[in-house]
From Swiss-Prot:
Name of protein: Putative 4'-phosphopantetheinyl transferase slr0495
GO biological process, one term: fatty acid biosynthetic process
Keywords from the named record: Magnesium, Metal-binding, Transferase
Single GO cellular component term: cytosol
Superkingdom of source: Bacteria
Binding site for Mg(2+): 110, 156
Cofactor(s), names only, from the UniProt record: Mg(2+)
InterPro entries: 4-PPantetheinyl_Trfase_dom (IPR008278), 4-PPantetheinyl_Trfase_dom_sf (IPR037143), AASDHPPT_N (IPR055066), P-Pant_transferase_sf (IPR050559), Ppantetheine-prot_Trfase_dom (IPR004568)
Stated role: Probably transfers the 4'-phosphopantetheine moiety from coenzyme A (CoA) to a serine residue of a carrier protein domain.
Pfam families xrefs: AASDHPPT_N, ACPS
Amino acid sequence: MLPQPQIWLCPTDRPLIPGYQALLSSEEMARGERYQRPQDKQRFLTMRLALRILLARQLDCLPQQLQFTYGPQGKPELVDRERRSPWFNVAHSGNYGLIGLSTEGEIGVDLQIMLPKPHYLKLAKRFFAPQEVQQLESLEGEKRTKLFYQLWTAKEAFLKATGKGISGGLNQVIPDENLAKYQYLPDSGDTNHWRLSSQPLLADQGSNDNYWMAIAWCTNEVNQVESNYLPNIQPFQWPRNLDSLP
């Protein structure tokens, strides 16, 4: 059985665990203070706390013992990463965040709240491949909105996994028409070793809004994941207090 990524869904509008400051670094606290809007600060602190707690559970250590370093585009990684340490990635939009962990290789997650905006085609013409623009032009209304976010999240998930961000070339990351795998990738990716899962955030997962998520992960195996594979989305469970942490 091929190891599959683990995905957690975390609401970002809930009260923070009392005493949370003890789990974060001074750099993280300072970064949180730089946000102008309270909801942005809340979102950042929530996701960084959740990430630390999940990684600490995996590595059997205290959350505050983890140290992070950052790539050229800001992608966080663990300092002195050990062989047993998972790869990870974080995304957030609206009132929700996603955390993805993988023991096989790099992983990227993206989450977007689907808001109808008039400039989708303008963005697509700038960042998407010509055939994708044609697909969008053939649709209207909700169908166009949905396809835009399906394509955008699939592209960004891969670029986040590789640590390149949007500058890595959105128009060079092309998912297949079923959003089950990648049809074409830049030089940094072999389509035979990258998996893609694209799905909505369902109402029974707690959302009253329309969200779309994508997960991209690298594997050493080839063609061993079903084309319709959807990772299990687990609700993140907050500890009741600091004393209940490992």
